[in-house]
């Protein structure tokens, strides 16, 4: 671990709990086919968008490579990088799911497991139609990143067709949001497809 990375971690320790910054041992992230491997000495586990923003803002300033890692079910190696002294940003604690009965909407964080989303919808008498073989371990952030289709794609569309808004943290730490009320969703620009 280089001195810049040590400085990065020391600054983050002021804002995050010890359980959110794991720097003991070596973390390995493999693709499901065991062809690619990503190694890092540090894994950070933010719980909300503001923490992700702080982490990325500081990493951008100090030029620390960040590798976001979700369920690691993707087959194209998106969770693998070639950098040294990279930091893994685990999305596992970004798993909150809320159902809004009045507007008939789900709001989910990027680390939410697809089967958990489907179960919550079912508990409220609704259907979240994305159906994948990996739904017990894949995360919705990865589904959106790859525009997953699944078994019901012909009837309901890809996952981006099911998404009405998006909140994302840019590499410089700025937060982008297209989260609006249902009335404001009529837009000529398909911002989610960009």
Task: Locate each region found by the language model.
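A common structural junction motif
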Residues: 16, 62-64, 125
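FAD-binding subdomain of flavoenzyme oxidoreductases
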Residues: 96-100, 104-110, 114-194
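ATP-grasp fold ATP-binding core
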Residues: 66-68, 130
């Amino acid at each position: 671990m280089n001195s810049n990375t040590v400085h990065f971690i020391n600054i983050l320790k002021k804002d995050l709990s010890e359980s959110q910054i794991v720097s003991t041992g070596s973390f390995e992230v493999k693709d499901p086919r065991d062809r690619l491997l990503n190694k890092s000495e540090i894994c950070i586990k933010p719980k909300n968008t503001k923490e992700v923003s702080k982490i990325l803002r500081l990493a951008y300033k100090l030029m620390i490579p960040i590798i976001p890692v979700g369920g690691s079910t993707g087959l194209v190696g998106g969770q693998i990088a070639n950098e040294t002294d990279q930091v893994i940003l685990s999305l596992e604690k970004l798993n909150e799911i809320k159902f809004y009965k009045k507007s008939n909407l789900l709001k989910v964080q990027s680390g939410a497991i697809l089967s958990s989303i489907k179960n919550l919808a079912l508990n409220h008498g609704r259907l979240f139609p994305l159906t994948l073989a990996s739904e017990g371990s894949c995360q919705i952030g990865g589904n959106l990143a790859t525009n997953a289709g699944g078994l019901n794609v012909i009837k309901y569309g890809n996952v981006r067709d099911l998404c009405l808004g998006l909140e994302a943290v840019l590499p410089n730490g700025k937060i982008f949001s297209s989260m609006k009320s249902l009335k404001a969703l009529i837009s000529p620009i398909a911002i989610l497809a960009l």
